[in-house]
Amino acid sequence: MSKAHKSWPHRRRNQFSSQRSLKKEMNFFQQQPPPFGTVPPQMTFPPNWQGVEKDPAFLTKDFNLLTLNNQPLPGNTSQPRAKGPENNLHNQYEQKVRPYIDLIDSLRALGVEQDLALPAIAVIGDQSSGKSSVLEALSGVALPRGSGIVTRCPLVLKLKKQPYKAWAGRISYQNTEIELQDPGQVEKEIHKAQNVMAGNGLGISHELISLEITSPEVPDLTIIDLPGIARVAVGNQPRDIGLQIKALIKRYIQRQQTINLVVVPCNVDIATTEALSMAHEVDPEGDRTIGILTKPDLMDRGTEKSIINVVRNLTYPLKKGYMIVKCRGQQEIINRLSLAEATKKEITFFQTHPCFRVLLEEGSATVPRLAERLTAELITHIQKSLPLLEEQIRESHQKATEELRRCGADIPSQDADKMFFLIEKIKMFNQDIEKLIEGEEVVRENETRLYNKIREDFKNWIGILATNTQKVKNIIHEEVEKYEKQYRGKELLGFVNYKTFETIVHQYIQHLVEPALSMLQKAVEIIRQAFVNMAKKHFGEFFNLNHTVQSKIEDIKVRHTEKAENMIQLQFRMEQIVFCQDQIYSVVVKKVREEIFNPLGKPSQNMKLNSHFPINESSVSSFNEIGVHLNAYFSETSTRLANQIPFIIQYFMLRENGDSLQKAMMQILQEKNRYSWLLQEQSETATKRRMLKERIYRLTQARHALCQFSSKEIH
């Protein structure tokens, strides 16, 4: 478990104690004459979400005082506004609720969402589902509306309640930021932003538009509006516009950090809506999906019962349940009905409706209740997500820092600095080459050191020597018999002809030349690849420098391969001279005799290698005698070659080759007029380094923001 996870319960305990004290204050306020806008005492919350996740303790029943337009809900229309308690409640609210939303908004403003998902509420719905009307009612501003695709870019709607301050807005996209002085500017500026980002047509863009609204008449809420789901392309729309929109929506709603707000009109079959189907696909248990029913005034008479069942979570269950709202209709928009008046009409609609009045009493209806509910859900969601978010930011920061380290430092602009930069690069490369030569290079878990790779070929060389020796043993009888028939002169039986012995030795030696040279070529390729990989590691981002080093590796390899090959050929030419020190040879011959004639340490009873010449126990045939000498000499020669050939390969291809490469690298520093050319960097590397620096900056700022937030929570 991370430190962030371990420390969080302590913060939460502190937080809950503050919430309990706040709850006592709320109880005091509720004992006073109800202030303007409070709900009637008999109002209860719908069971479909009350029992699943309780609201944070600091979101009290007086919460609607702080939401839309300060409109009163039914049951309390005449009381004067209690400014004292409301102001105190707002201060407590600002201390406990607003910081969570501000924290996530600040992280989103830093661009942290490019690196990891942040807690959010995303609004999805089919075209003409009433999605824009719901957002208008929440924000108090007119958003783009009409037929077809209206929302063409994700819109982050940041609502911040500021009592006693004038309305203010700001829209941001790409490198543009525009201050808005009037709500009437919003729709025009969003249209303009969408045209810049998605083109003057009907295409879509994945880039975000940020709309921030500060007003005394909005709830504290951040919500992401996504394009409406289109089933078929019309007009000049791309033929795959439906797939594009679904891919964009899925990118947001599949994140575990996102609460999905699914808008469904009452006059359609809820089970067939594409939006709810997409939400179910990414959230099959309905843990983070809230259903919003719209247009209750357009449904057929007599079907109200089915809608009540949906809102009560009896038809298509969601753990977070449903809400129902009535926003401005098209005719009301044409008649310029204000949003404030629309909210009043909505409350009147539910209050006077014979079937839906019960939903109002249960707290499942009206936009003000929806605003309250969404803020509570968002705050709870943020609280749950913060420990994991801290850990993700820490891990992402660490990973980006490591990637930046591998990219290396920026290339200096001054010639003198370029020289020092190049010296450092070559120095590090030479140090790693030296480690390869000495068998001390650092390797990862599944990698093997260079020496071990070569050693495998050296082991195979011992097997080749043993196999060749066995072949000679098998042809001894044939060779001696050939001599007896063709070349024997006046020698008596049993006398070994030295020429026969020497001929067999020469053949044996000659058969080893090709395997030895083959082993050399394998070792050369292994070493060359190791040097090339090291060059890519150090100079891969500098294509000219890397090409120069690769050429030097190849040239030096060819030169030293030729030297090693010549030395191996010389070694085998020397092996044509049959020689061994008497003291050494006599010991080996004695040992071989014992192994052949007395392998178990017992006197030999019968040694007959040729039935044509029966011999007694005291005599030794020419076959046995020449076999003894060949075995003895081959044993000594194999021991010598088993070490000598690997010595030659290591000396020329590792030590000499590596040393020559290091010297050649230092010679590059003499070419001062080529520094700029050598240090030309691949554009991808420069771009990657810049992006990593930006990511590290974002994540550093995010860690700082989380640290400050956590310290405030603790204190």
From Swiss-Prot:
Gene Ontology BP term (one): response to interferon-alpha
Annotated GED domain residues: 623-714
Cellular-component GO terms for this entry: cytoplasm; microtubule; nuclear pore; nucleus; plasma membrane; presynapse; synapse
Region ranges (G4 motif): 294-297
InterPro entries: Dynamin, Dynamin_GTPase, Dynamin_GTPase_CS, Dynamin_N, Dynamin_stalk, G_DYNAMIN_dom, GED, GED_dom
G3 motif: annotated span: 225-228
Region annotation G2 motif: where it falls in the sequence: 150-152
Keywords: Antiviral defense, Cytoplasm, GTP-binding, Immunity, Innate immunity, Nucleotide-binding, Nucleus
Region (G1 motif): 125-132
Basic residues biased stretches: 1-14
Induction profile: By type I and type III interferons.
Binding residues for GTP: 125-132, 225-229, 294-297
Composition skew (Polar residues), residue ranges: 69-80
Annotated stretches, region: Disordered: 1-24, 69-88
Pfam families from the UniProt entry: Dynamin_M (PF01031), Dynamin_N (PF00350), GED (PF02212)
Stretches for region G5 motif: 326-329
The protein's name: Interferon-induced GTP-binding protein Mx2
Taxonomic path: Eukaryota, Metazoa, Chordata, Craniata, Vertebrata
